[in-house]
């Protein structure tokens, strides 16, 4: 089984204020995108010019202004500053308001968003992953059962009921940057999320084989798992803009350890601004030729990544949406 190509738009919540971002999302639906995803940050990647609107409030506004696109998080961490029962309630409400259009993308989190609101020490991966598994289990119980009594290592409910919930549970997409969580996505995720630009071997040797392994372990058809990849694409007919638009997002080019451990946007910005442009641009597909873009994206679709969500780094998002629809969408849908 293989799923059809879907084209999505990444609403850059760390770059734009919530009103701008809603309007860009409405425009994305108008320009033919199939989905819109948003990250859920308490703090942005950079202090200067950064934004961090609350994803849950924002999704409600977007749901009311759109009628067709799938909407969801990429990603939200339901484990520290949130109680997963509250996230279950929130997404059940979204599911009632926008049936069939909502998904919850989850990950193990970043210190940047948790320590600012009181988490004293950033836990090791083992605890973060255990919390994620437990939170997903609890949320699914709350979406399908009543009077849930849950006694986990980290979370507990007593006769808990989500009173307003859709007839079908909210799809949970699991974000992974390594084999351990990717195997979990294959076992338990309705969808899988990863990001582009991290070296071919990560996808061919680690992530996708791990998703397959996890699915095989529980007798699932991995081909039926919606495999979403956030593609970092700086496309513009003007080559100078295509390159220099990536500068705002230089923090994405920091090491995984830096991104997971730094807790201050000012520190993140200082570390990122010290990076050379060549290193910043390496995380992105930087191009002015649409055929070059399609050829590079074909690498991912050939691996079975079917849900292509495009993150454009420039400040002129309407320009990106227009040139994407004109130059890229028809070519990508034919892959």
Curated annotation (Swiss-Prot):
Active site location: 41 (proton donor), 110 (proton acceptor)
Biological process, per Gene Ontology: carbohydrate metabolic process
Residue sites binding substrate per the record: 195, 198, 259, 283
Record keyword Oxidoreductase present: yes
Catalyses which reaction(s): oxidized coenzyme F420-(gamma-L-Glu)(n) + D-glucose 6-phosphate + H(+) = 6-phospho-D-glucono-1,5-lactone + reduced coenzyme F420-(gamma-L-Glu)(n)
Keyword annotations of the record: Carbohydrate metabolism, Oxidoreductase
Matches recorded under Pfam families: Bac_luciferase
Domain of life where this protein originates: Bacteria
Alphabetical list of NCBIfam families matching this protein: F420_G6P_DH (TIGR03554), F420_G6P_family (TIGR03557)
Subunit: Homodimer.
Homology family: Belongs to the F420-dependent glucose-6-phosphate dehydrogenase family.
Protein name: F420-dependent glucose-6-phosphate dehydrogenase
Organism: Segniliparus rotundus (strain ATCC BAA-972 / CDC 1076 / CIP 108378 / DSM 44985 / JCM 13578)
